[in-house]
Amino acid sequence: MKPTIEINEANFETEVLKSNQPVLVDFWAEWCGPCKMLAPMLDEIAVEQSGRVKVAKVNVDDNPALAARFGIHSIPTLLYFADGELRNQTVGVVNRKTILSKLEKIAVAT
Protein backbone atom coordinates (compact mmCIF):
# COMPACT_ATOMS: atom_id res chain seq x y z
CA MET A 1 0.00 0.00 0.00
CA LYS A 2 1.32 3.42 -0.95
CA PRO A 3 1.82 5.88 1.90
CA THR A 4 0.39 8.74 -0.18
CA ILE A 5 -3.14 9.16 -1.52
CA GLU A 6 -3.81 9.73 -5.22
CA ILE A 7 -6.13 12.70 -5.61
CA ASN A 8 -8.35 13.49 -8.59
CA GLU A 9 -11.38 15.65 -9.36
CA ALA A 10 -13.74 13.06 -7.88
CA ASN A 11 -12.11 12.66 -4.46
CA PHE A 12 -10.47 16.07 -3.89
CA GLU A 13 -13.28 17.49 -1.77
CA THR A 14 -13.60 14.41 0.43
CA GLU A 15 -9.88 13.66 0.85
CA VAL A 16 -8.60 17.24 1.11
CA LEU A 17 -11.25 19.85 1.84
CA LYS A 18 -13.30 17.71 4.25
CA SER A 19 -10.32 15.99 5.89
CA ASN A 20 -10.16 16.12 9.68
CA GLN A 21 -6.35 16.22 9.39
CA PRO A 22 -4.02 18.72 7.73
CA VAL A 23 -3.28 17.68 4.14
CA LEU A 24 -0.12 18.19 2.12
CA VAL A 25 -0.95 18.04 -1.60
CA ASP A 26 1.86 17.48 -4.10
CA PHE A 27 1.10 18.65 -7.66
CA TRP A 28 3.44 16.66 -9.90
CA ALA A 29 3.89 15.00 -13.30
CA GLU A 30 5.52 11.76 -14.45
CA TRP A 31 7.96 13.60 -16.73
CA CYS A 32 9.11 16.07 -14.03
CA GLY A 33 12.62 15.32 -12.76
CA PRO A 34 12.38 17.51 -9.64
CA CYS A 35 9.04 15.85 -8.80
CA LYS A 36 10.74 12.44 -8.88
CA MET A 37 13.45 13.77 -6.55
CA LEU A 38 10.84 14.97 -4.05
CA ALA A 39 8.62 11.86 -4.12
CA PRO A 40 10.66 9.57 -1.80
CA MET A 41 10.85 12.27 0.87
CA LEU A 42 7.08 12.82 0.69
CA ASP A 43 6.53 9.06 1.04
CA GLU A 44 8.73 9.06 4.17
CA ILE A 45 6.86 12.03 5.63
CA ALA A 46 3.54 10.30 4.91
CA VAL A 47 4.66 7.24 6.89
CA GLU A 48 6.19 9.23 9.75
CA GLN A 49 3.21 11.60 10.07
CA SER A 50 0.53 8.94 9.56
CA GLY A 51 -2.50 9.72 11.70
CA ARG A 52 -1.49 13.38 12.07
CA VAL A 53 -1.10 14.57 8.48
CA LYS A 54 -2.35 13.23 5.17
CA VAL A 55 0.00 13.38 2.17
CA ALA A 56 -1.72 13.42 -1.21
CA LYS A 57 -0.58 13.63 -4.84
CA VAL A 58 -2.24 15.21 -7.88
CA ASN A 59 -0.90 14.32 -11.32
CA VAL A 60 -1.31 17.59 -13.24
CA ASP A 61 -1.48 15.81 -16.61
CA ASP A 62 -4.39 13.66 -15.45
CA ASN A 63 -6.12 16.46 -13.50
CA PRO A 64 -5.60 19.75 -15.37
CA ALA A 65 -8.73 21.35 -13.89
CA LEU A 66 -7.42 20.88 -10.34
CA ALA A 67 -4.07 22.36 -11.34
CA ALA A 68 -5.84 25.32 -12.94
CA ARG A 69 -8.11 25.78 -9.92
CA PHE A 70 -5.07 26.41 -7.73
CA GLY A 71 -3.04 28.31 -10.31
CA ILE A 72 -0.34 25.67 -10.61
CA HIS A 73 2.16 26.87 -13.23
CA SER A 74 5.35 25.18 -11.98
CA ILE A 75 5.85 21.74 -10.51
CA PRO A 76 6.44 20.38 -8.04
CA THR A 77 4.11 22.62 -6.07
CA LEU A 78 3.12 21.65 -2.54
CA LEU A 79 -0.12 23.03 -1.11
CA TYR A 80 -0.79 22.83 2.61
CA PHE A 81 -4.46 22.57 3.63
CA ALA A 82 -6.11 22.61 7.05
CA ASP A 83 -9.81 22.80 7.89
CA GLY A 84 -10.65 22.88 4.18
CA GLU A 85 -8.56 25.98 3.51
CA LEU A 86 -5.30 26.53 1.69
CA ARG A 87 -2.87 27.69 4.38
CA ASN A 88 0.52 27.72 2.63
CA GLN A 89 2.42 26.60 -0.46
CA THR A 90 5.91 25.96 -1.77
CA VAL A 91 7.08 25.75 -5.37
CA GLY A 92 10.03 23.65 -6.50
CA VAL A 93 12.08 21.15 -4.57
CA VAL A 94 12.23 22.09 -0.91
CA ASN A 95 14.03 20.40 1.94
CA ARG A 96 12.47 18.16 4.55
CA LYS A 97 12.88 20.73 7.33
CA THR A 98 10.87 23.32 5.38
CA ILE A 99 8.03 20.88 4.70
CA LEU A 100 7.85 19.68 8.30
CA SER A 101 7.95 23.26 9.60
CA LYS A 102 5.03 24.29 7.39
CA LEU A 103 3.07 21.17 8.38
CA GLU A 104 3.70 21.90 12.05
CA LYS A 105 2.44 25.47 11.66
CA ILE A 106 -0.82 24.42 10.02
CA ALA A 107 -1.32 21.55 12.48
CA VAL A 108 -0.97 23.95 15.42
CA ALA A 109 -3.38 26.42 13.81
CA THR A 110 -6.17 23.83 13.48
Language-model features and meaning:
Residues 3, 8, 28, 54-56:
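Conserved Rossmann-like nucleotide-binding pocket used by diverse enzymes
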Residues 4-23:
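A short beta-strand-turn-helix
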Residues 20-22, 39-58:
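Conserved helix-turn-beta segment immediately C-terminal to the redox Cys motif
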Residues 20-21, 28-31, 74:
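Short pre-active-site segment immediately N-terminal to redox-active cysteine/selenocysteine motifs
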Residues 27-41:
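Conserved redox-active cysteine motifs that mediate thiol-disulfide chemistry
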Residues 58-67:
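Structural microenvironment flanking redox-active thiols in thiol-disulfide oxidoreductases
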Residues 79-110:
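Non-catalytic, surface beta->alpha helical segment in thiol-disulfide oxidoreductase systems
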